[in-house]
């Protein structure tokens, strides 16, 4: 089956940034998981963070959830400590994200922000500053 949806993913300092767009199926989720793992390789067994932009994301099919759930386990097992999700209030997005990613597990913490600046401020306060001038996304 053809992948549906799009993403940009890039790294800045010890932060993996991603922008998701469109409605996602299992194939797009797998492509994202594979690219995410590749980009995160330099941080494995260290402490790192993630920020994801979800305003243009239109949710995922039920089949996509198992792929993302496996990715969530992988990132936490490999040193992810903070995740900032950026999107305007949406009960559907919140439901799907809450289903896939717990708010906290051991020393991992996830927070949701309306504004990018709030997410950057929180990550910086937590020890993960982002230099916006260094954003180099790779797209799918």
Where are these regions (language model features)?
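Amphipathic, Lys/Arg-enriched alpha-helical "gate/interface" segment within cytosolic domains
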Residues: 1-140
């Amino acid at each position: 089956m053809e992948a549906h949806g799009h993403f940009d993913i890039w790294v800045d300092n010890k932060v993996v940034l991603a922008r998701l767009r469109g409605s996602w199926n299992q194939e797009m989720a797998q492509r994202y998981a594979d690219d995410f793992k590749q980009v995160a390789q330099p941080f494995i067994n260290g402490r790192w963070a993630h920020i994801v932009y979800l305003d243009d994301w239109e949710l995922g099919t039920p089949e996509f959830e198992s792929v993302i759930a496996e990715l969530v386990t992988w990132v936490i097992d490999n040193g992810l400590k903070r995740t900032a999700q950026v999107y305007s209030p949406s009960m559907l997005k919140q439901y799907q994200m809450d289903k896939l990613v717990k708010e906290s597990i051991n020393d991992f913490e996830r927070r949701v922000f309306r504004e990018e600046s709030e997410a950057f401020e929180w990550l910086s306060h937590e020890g993960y500053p982002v230099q916006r001038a260094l954003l180099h996304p790779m797209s799918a």
